[in-house]
Amino acid sequence: MVASAPASAGTKGVIRQVIGPVLDVEFPAGKLPKIYNALRVEAKNTSGQDVALTAEVQQLLGDHRVRAVAMSGTDGLVRGMEAVDTGAPISVPVGEATLGRIFNVLGEPVDEQGPVKTKTTAPIHREAPKLTELETKPKVFETGIKVIDLLAPYRQGGKVGLFGGAGVGKTVLIQELINNIAKEHGGVSVFGGVGERTREGNDLYEEFKESGVINADDLSKSKVALCYGQMNEPPGARMRVGLSALTMAEHFRDVNKQDVLLFVDNIFRFVQAGSEVSALLGRMPSAVGYQPTLGTDVGTLQERVASTVEGSITSIQAVYVPADDLTDPAPATTFAHLDATTVLNRALASKGIYPAVDPLDSSSTMLQPAVVGDEHYRTARAVQSTLQRYKELQDIIAILGLDELSEDDRQTVDRARKVEKFLSQPFFVAEIFTGMPGKYVKLDETIAGFNQILAGELDDLPEQAFYLVGSIEEVKAKAQKMAAESK
């Protein structure tokens, strides 16, 4: 961490070279800024227009020069312009005042809602928590979403990869998780939009307002802070906006002592931005053109996402897989840090099973008897083996029909279909679209429900009674209602 009144603060340097987003700046002897210090350039360009940008020092070159990466466009910069050392890293606003607001990488509000009502800021660079500060005992983070809690449970203070194409329900799942942590855990969320489409960022903001996650009338009642560095922005912004969002989350954990959800969409773009500036910084490219510091860059970000004795940051990261190649260095490096994967499946979404989480592809390191207990583990494995058997039988059913199956296989198919339907669930944030009240299902209710289905206790209930409900009691009530209506 940089001292509060560094000797280099206010030192003026001169821009000597501009190559795309990278600047070389010369400072007086003995007054070089430190690595990660922010430099501020405020001047007029050749057309007489104001130029204002912030750059972050990345390298000390010798000959009193430093090399810095700009956080915004370098159009209009010319050699000879003045750059001032701020004496500290980029700092962003933190605390309750950030909720319901949208920020850029520098912590400046970009939502036209006026200035942020806080003087509390924090630098975006800091050390990961020490081992002695960490909560090392694995603890399941209950989401209230049946398919996740049963088959791929999240670890409190862990990291989850969210895989899924366009239109399969990533955003709705993210919104529901934000809603549930606010209601059930009294926690807040931070959303880091890293290198994704501007339209998606705007759509997400509007959907948050519609679903009540952001309260437009009283921002203090909002449950999420947003930090965007979009696809059209320079690589410097995309490379650092994840750290800006993480810094906001760390304040809620360490100072407010809350459980925080940190969403990063998309973690691949963070790596991509690093590779864009790597060559300009004079580093030799590594495998597939990525930066040689790939492992360090990802590790520095991921190790700060942790559960401490004060509170936890549970991170859910959308992971783009280039050309569906899981061996690509970017996703491969990310996978090493993940505790769980939630895979969204288009085939399930097309069947109307929401959330469209694939029960066979999703996985978690938490799903072991020593952590979740024997009953949970046995139930989860029984659900997966039933669904796997159903998947194997689908080709036979498609060709020969159900009647050609053995009695045991027919029973397996019947129960698997009920299990598949029961894995669906109405969401609070989708109430305005579905007209159905959302459901938060406790883990013990989830386990009890699936046990009853697999034990054959509900074989006489119609399949449709299991669709889009919460607990197993609602299934029974729905079945009774359906029976009464059919008379």
From Swiss-Prot:
<dbReference type="InterPro" id="IPR000194">
    <property type="entry name" value="ATPase_F1/V1/A1_a/bsu_nucl-bd"/>
</dbReference>
<comment type="similarity">
    <text>Belongs to the ATPase alpha/beta chains family.</text>
</comment>
<dbReference type="GO" id="GO:0046933">
    <property type="term" value="F:proton-transporting ATP synthase activity, rotational mechanism"/>
</dbReference>
<dbReference type="Pfam" id="PF22919">
    <property type="entry name" value="ATP-synt_VA_C"/>
</dbReference>
<keyword id="KW-0066">ATP synthesis</keyword>
<dbReference type="GO" id="GO:0016887">
    <property type="term" value="F:ATP hydrolysis activity"/>
</dbReference>
<keyword id="KW-1278">Translocase</keyword>
<keyword id="KW-0139">CF(1)</keyword>
<dbReference type="GO" id="GO:0031676">
    <property type="term" value="C:plasma membrane-derived thylakoid membrane"/>
</dbReference>
<feature type="binding site">
    <location>
        <begin position="164"/>
        <end position="171"/>
    </location>
    <ligand>
        <name>ATP</name>
    </ligand>
</feature>
<dbReference type="InterPro" id="IPR055190">
    <property type="entry name" value="ATP-synt_VA_C"/>
</dbReference>
<dbReference type="InterPro" id="IPR004100">
    <property type="entry name" value="ATPase_F1/V1/A1_a/bsu_N"/>
</dbReference>
<dbReference type="InterPro" id="IPR027417">
    <property type="entry name" value="P-loop_NTPase"/>
</dbReference>
<dbReference type="InterPro" id="IPR036121">
    <property type="entry name" value="ATPase_F1/V1/A1_a/bsu_N_sf"/>
</dbReference>
<keyword id="KW-0472">Membrane</keyword>
<keyword id="KW-0067">ATP-binding</keyword>
<keyword id="KW-0547">Nucleotide-binding</keyword>
<dbReference type="GO" id="GO:0045259">
    <property type="term" value="C:proton-transporting ATP synthase complex"/>
</dbReference>
<keyword id="KW-0375">Hydrogen ion transport</keyword>
<dbReference type="InterPro" id="IPR003593">
    <property type="entry name" value="AAA+_ATPase"/>
</dbReference>
<keyword id="KW-0813">Transport</keyword>
<comment type="subunit">
    <text>F-type ATPases have 2 components, CF(1) - the catalytic core - and CF(0) - the membrane proton channel. CF(1) has five subunits: alpha(3), beta(3), gamma(1), delta(1), epsilon(1). CF(0) has four main subunits: a(1), b(1), b'(1) and c(9-12).</text>
</comment>
<dbReference type="Pfam" id="PF02874">
    <property type="entry name" value="ATP-synt_ab_N"/>
</dbReference>
<dbReference type="Pfam" id="PF00006">
    <property type="entry name" value="ATP-synt_ab"/>
</dbReference>
<dbReference type="GO" id="GO:0005524">
    <property type="term" value="F:ATP binding"/>
</dbReference>
<keyword id="KW-0793">Thylakoid</keyword>
<dbReference type="InterPro" id="IPR020003">
    <property type="entry name" value="ATPase_a/bsu_AS"/>
</dbReference>
<protein>
    <recommendedName>
        <fullName>ATP synthase subunit beta</fullName>
        <ecNumber>7.1.2.2</ecNumber>
    </recommendedName>
</protein>
<dbReference type="InterPro" id="IPR050053">
    <property type="entry name" value="ATPase_alpha/beta_chains"/>
</dbReference>
<dbReference type="InterPro" id="IPR024034">
    <property type="entry name" value="ATPase_F1/V1_b/a_C"/>
</dbReference>
<dbReference type="InterPro" id="IPR005722">
    <property type="entry name" value="ATP_synth_F1_bsu"/>
</dbReference>
<keyword id="KW-0406">Ion transport</keyword>
<comment type="function">
    <text>Produces ATP from ADP in the presence of a proton gradient across the membrane. The catalytic sites are hosted primarily by the beta subunits.</text>
</comment>
